[in-house]
Amino acid sequence: MDIYERQPDLLMTRLAQNCKARRLEKGLSRNTLAAKCGVPAPTIERFERTGKISLESFCRIAVEFDYFDELSAILSRTKYSTSEELESINRNRSRIKGR
């Protein structure tokens, strides 16, 4: 993927499009999804239109669509770009967690 395609706003738009697609595949109206996951229908509508939503509301929608494990896996493994970055990560692992 091109570096210019890795912008947060594009990710937000893609996530919103994917959520809308899952909702429509399941034949759910926004109101029905809202009742199931506890996120107000106007919030779902705004998310689908703009990509903007709170993390809590996004998680509620994703869990309703059974994506708990996939969301839990985000940021769960180490990623690095250079050998220097990997060395730094390994050094930091020896530090006390949370400090």
Predicted features, each with a name:
Residues M1-E25:
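A short, Lys/Arg-rich alpha-helix, primarily the initiator
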